[in-house]
Amino acid sequence: MTGPVPDARVIDGKAFAAGLRARIADAVPAFRAATGRAPGLAVVLVGDDPASAVYVGSKGKATVAAGMASFEHRLAATATQDEVEALLRQLNADEAVDGILLQLPLPGHLDEQAAVATIDPDKDVDGLTPVSAGRLALGIPGMVPCTPYGCLLLLQDRLGDLSGKDAIVIGRSILVGKPMGQLLLGANCTVTMAHSRTKDLPALVRRADIVVAAVGRAEMVKGDWIKPGAIVIDVGINRLPPADGAAKGRLVGDVDYAAALGVADAITPVPGGVGPMTIACLLRNTLVAAHRRAGLADPEGF
C-alpha cells in the first residue's frame, strides 16, 4: 500500500538536503585517502542560549554522520571579547580544522562583527567575514553563506538555468538578503532588492518569477501578491501566538503558505523547506574549504 502522492508544488527541502548530505559523505573518503585525515568543522558556542545549544548539537551530529571531524568549543556567557577572539585565532592555526562556525547571536556585551572578522576567511564556512562578502560581490571563489546558497540550490534544482528570470529578494540582512541578491545576480537573474521601506511591494512581487522572502514577518507576503507560476522560497521562521487552549503557536514563514500554494508553481514549506538546507550547505562548505586548504581541486559536483 502506497502513501499519499506528494504535492509537486511543495519543494521538499528535507529530502533535497538528505541527498546532498549523502553525496558529501560519499566524497569524504577520497579526501581522507588524499590527506590522511577527515575534513574538520569547529563550532564555537558562547553562553547557554537553549536554541543555540540545540543548533550546535544538530550541527555536530550531522558533521559526524558525514564522516567529518566535529570539534565543539563552549565559552561562558561572561566570556570577554579577547577570550572569544583568542579561541578563534587558535582554531585558525589548527591544521585539523577546515571550517569555523561562530554560533550567533553572541551575548550582548560582545562585538559580533569584530569576532566574526577574526575568523580566517579560508575557514569561514558561514561566509560572514568581510573578506567572504567581498569575494562574493566580486565573483571570486570563496565561502558563501549557507542559507542563501541552499536557496540557490533549491531554485536551480527546480528551474535549471536561472538566466533572465526576474527575482525579488525581500529582506536585506547580511545573513540572507544581501548574499541572496548577489547569488541571483551571479546566476544571471534580474534582481530587485526589497525591504521595509520599499514602496508598493505587492506590485514588485507580482512581476517576479522568483520570490525569496527573508524579512522576518509572519505571513507578510500574501497569496495575491504572487505571480501565477512563480517559484517562492520562504526563508522566514516565525512563531504565531498560541491558539486558544494550545501550549504554543504554530511555526509559519514570511509567506501566507496556504494562499500562495494555490498560485505559485512551487513553494518551500515552513518548516521543512529552507531550514534543512542550511546544515547541509554548512557541510558542503566545510568539504570545499578542506579541499582548497589541502591544495586539491574542488570536489566534483559541489
From Swiss-Prot:
Family matches, as SUPFAM superfamilies: Aminoacid dehydrogenase-like, N-terminal domain, NAD(P)-binding Rossmann-fold domains
Oligomeric form and interacting partners: Homodimer.
Key words of the record: Amino-acid biosynthesis, Histidine biosynthesis, Hydrolase, Methionine biosynthesis, Multifunctional enzyme, NADP, One-carbon metabolism, Oxidoreductase, Purine biosynthesis
Role according to the record: Catalyzes the oxidation of 5,10-methylenetetrahydrofolate to 5,10-methenyltetrahydrofolate and then the hydrolysis of 5,10-methenyltetrahydrofolate to 10-formyltetrahydrofolate.
Organism: Sphingopyxis alaskensis (strain DSM 13593 / LMG 18877 / RB2256) (Sphingomonas alaskensis)
Binding site for NADP(+): 171-173, 196, 237
Pathway connected to this protein: One-carbon metabolism; tetrahydrofolate interconversion
Name of the featured protein: Bifunctional protein FolD
PROSITE patterns registered for this protein in UniProt: THF_DHG_CYH_2 (PS00767)
Keyword Amino-acid biosynthesis: yes
CDD domains (UniProt xref): NAD_bind_m-THF_DH_Cyclohyd
InterPro entries: Aminoacid_DH-like_N_sf (IPR046346), NAD(P)-bd_dom_sf (IPR036291), THF_DH/CycHdrlase (IPR000672), THF_DH/CycHdrlase_cat_dom (IPR020630), THF_DH/CycHdrlase_CS (IPR020867), THF_DH/CycHdrlase_NAD-bd_dom (IPR020631)
Top-rank taxon: Bacteria
EC number(s) per entry: 1.5.1.5, 3.5.4.9
UniProt catalytic activity: (6R)-5,10-methylene-5,6,7,8-tetrahydrofolate + NADP(+) = (6R)-5,10-methenyltetrahydrofolate + NADPH; (6R)-5,10-methenyltetrahydrofolate + H2O = (6R)-10-formyltetrahydrofolate + H(+)
GO biological process: L-histidine biosynthetic process; methionine biosynthetic process; purine nucleotide biosynthetic process; tetrahydrofolate interconversion
GO cellular component: cytosol
Membership in a protein family: Belongs to the tetrahydrofolate dehydrogenase/cyclohydrolase family.
Chloroplast recorded as keyword: no
PANTHER family membership: C-1-TETRAHYDROFOLATE SYNTHASE, CYTOPLASMIC (PTHR48099:SF5), C-1-TETRAHYDROFOLATE SYNTHASE, CYTOPLASMIC-RELATED (PTHR48099)
MF annotations from Gene Ontology: methenyltetrahydrofolate cyclohydrolase activity; methylenetetrahydrofolate dehydrogenase (NADP+) activity
